[in-house]
């Protein structure tokens, strides 16, 4: 909720708007200040010899094997005896790799023919604690009779007045994981699910990192931990509750805890490390890459990233979002 402006102030200029996939370097946060989102580290901030994760995007026409061979030559040219090891491959929403290589080889990798972009991986911190002093926040009035623990998202958003309750729809929550045994998800699905155990099993061979993802229930037809590379997508730590919170608002379906679309299914893509809660770019991109195969109707990304496309990392995400849009998937990314 934005704080009111004094009456004498002039209205702000209209926000810039660009098509999905284009890059707008002028975007700022809602306060008008540049976001403090972690930027991709630069080579002068990291020991050049330190082996780090480098995310690489290839041109669409590039040959994957030939490009990797050229990248290895480039790395060895800067650090003799070293090579780039493939950690992950992307081939659906993005054509590229996540590689482990010396940080100081970044510029050499960028110069390889067929490489369109490359950056040192970021790790986004997760903080689930908000205060009244947070950007744009003000205290909302509360009636004495209100029980905030039992407020329905449907009533808050007037979604209870709609006849559609998410029937036949699939929402992917790419977040810190979801506590799928939480009572908020204990209701009965009242419509024929779009994803069944059989259909998910049929899609699995086409998936990238999530090949061993699991079908949990009609409510949760697919779950995978892309950060730790295992099928346990349950959250860890206090900040890990964020994904469960988001999923409950989105599609909770039990008693007084009702989400906006209670009959929708939820794909759980955990992208936060269990060890420290950080969200690495390589895991997030792997989850997004698999969504081209799983084809949810909507992806929810509430990770606090800025929409300001001001570096190679964010430009790469713009490419991914455009690919998902072309696949018929709506991406809702909160800044």
What do these predicted regions represent?
Residues 4, 73-170, 184-187, 191, ...:
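Autoinhibitory propeptides
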Residues 60-63, 93-94, 104-106, 122-126, ...:
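Solvent-exposed loop/turn segments at secondary-structure junctions
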Residues 286-292:
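Hydrophobic, small-residue-rich alpha-helical packing segments that form membrane-like cores
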């Amino acid at each position: 909720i934005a704080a009111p402006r004094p009456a004498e102030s002039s209205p702000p200029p209209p926000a810039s708007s660009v098509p999905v996939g284009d890059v707008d370097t002028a975007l700022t946060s809602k306060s008008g200040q540049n976001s403090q989102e972690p930027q991709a580290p630069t080579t002068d901030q990291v020991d050049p010899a330190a082996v780090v994760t480098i995310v690489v995007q290839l041109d669409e026409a590039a040959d994957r094997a030939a490009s990797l061979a050229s990248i290895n030559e480039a790395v060895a040219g800067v650090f003799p005896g070293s090579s780039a090891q493939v950690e992950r491959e992307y081939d659906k929403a993005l054509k590229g790799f996540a590689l482990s290589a010396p940080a100081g080889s970044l510029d050499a990798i960028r110069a390889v023919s067929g490489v369109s972009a490359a950056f040192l991986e970021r790790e986004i911190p997760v903080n689930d604690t908000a205060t009244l002093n947070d950007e744009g926040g003000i205290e909302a009035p509360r009636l004495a009779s209100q029980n905030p623990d039992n407020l329905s998202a449907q009533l808050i958003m007037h979604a209870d007045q709609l006849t559609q309750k998410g029937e036949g729809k699939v929402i992917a929550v790419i977040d810190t994981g979801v506590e799928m045994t939480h009572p908020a998800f204990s209701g009965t699905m009242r419509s024929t699910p779009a994803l069944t155990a059989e259909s998910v099993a049929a899609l699995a061979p086409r998936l990238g990192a999530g090949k061993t993802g699991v079908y949990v229930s009609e409510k949760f037809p697919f779950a995978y931990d892309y950060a730790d590379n295992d099928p346990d997508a349950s959250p860890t730590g206090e900040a890990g509750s964020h994904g469960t919170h988001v999923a409950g608002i989105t599609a909770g379906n039990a008693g007084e805890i009702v989400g906006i679309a209670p009959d929708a299914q939820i794909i759980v893509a955990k992208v936060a490390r269990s060890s420290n809660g950080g969200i690495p770019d390589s895991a997030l991109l792997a989850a997004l890459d698999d969504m081209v195969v799983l084809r949810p109707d909507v992806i929810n990304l509430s990770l606090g990233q800025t929409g300001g496309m001001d570096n190679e990392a964010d430009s790469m995400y713009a490419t991914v979002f455009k690919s998902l849009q072309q696949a018929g998937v709506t991406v809702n990314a909160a800044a």
